[in-house]
């Protein structure tokens, strides 16, 4: 079976990793993460259930999505803050600064 080149990336605020690897054609996004060995670089990462995406687009079923040559699998971290709540806080600060 032919091999394809893909990348697996993960980033924390203080540390990032980009791993390039060759995988058999038809390998799923989740399997590529496992094959990359990124769990050894970030032992706290649970690669079996973390959300994945490709080039900034989240995957609904990373276990079923076969990769294409050159794709970058991104491992997503949970959000630290609720985006809606952050917007509310920012708006409240802006109102307070304007004196509304």
From Swiss-Prot:
HAMAP family with a match to the protein in the record: UPF0125_RnfH
Organism, scientific name: Pseudomonas paraeruginosa (strain DSM 24068 / PA7)
Assigned protein family: Belongs to the UPF0125 (RnfH) family.
Entry superkingdom: Bacteria
InterPro entries according to UniProt: Mopterin_synth/thiamin_S_b (IPR016155), RnfH (IPR005346), RnfH_sf (IPR037021)
Protein name, entry field: Protein RnfH
């Amino acid at each position: 079976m032919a091999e394809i080149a893909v990348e697996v990336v993960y980033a924390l605020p203080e540390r990032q990793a980009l791993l390039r690897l060759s995988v058999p054609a038809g390998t799923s996004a989740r399997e590529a993460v496992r094959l990359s060995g990124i769990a050894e670089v970030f032992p706290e990462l649970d690669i079996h259930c973390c959300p994945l995406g490709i080039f900034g687009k989240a995957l609904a079923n990373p276990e079923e999505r076969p990769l294409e040559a050159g794709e970058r699998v991104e491992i997503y971290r949970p959000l630290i803050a609720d985006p809606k709540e952050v917007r509310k806080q920012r708006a409240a600060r802006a109102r307070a600064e304007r004196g509304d």
